[in-house]
Amino acid sequence: MHESTILSAGSTNPFNRIVSAVMLALIELYRRWISPLIGPRCRFIPTCSAYGIEAIQRHGPWRGGWLTLRRLLRCHPFTPCGCDPVPD
């Protein structure tokens, strides 16, 4: 992960940069170690982890984290599959 991709939302606040880095590291941890064990389960395109990375990079840790949480809550067997991109 390069520092330039940690926050594309333009924040220079060091705290936000740290929070973003931690959130992105947790997503990478999930992708590398947990996801291979449980297999593909996401009902959307892009996957929830890819969505989370993009949302945090584009909108910063707070709005990006909120969008990611909302997406995770929508990803269950009773929701129809489909394309759900990160909003602008």
Curated annotation (Swiss-Prot):
It is a peripheral membrane protein. InterPro entries: Membr_insert_effic_factor_YidD. It is found in: Cell inner membrane. Keywords: Cell inner membrane, Cell membrane, Membrane. One of its GO terms (cellular component) is plasma membrane. PANTHER family: MEMBRANE PROTEIN INSERTION EFFICIENCY FACTOR-RELATED. Belongs to the UPF0161 family. Could be involved in insertion of integral membrane proteins into the membrane. This is Putative membrane protein insertion efficiency factor. The lineage of its organism: Bacteria, Bacillati, Cyanobacteriota, Cyanophyceae, Synechococcales.
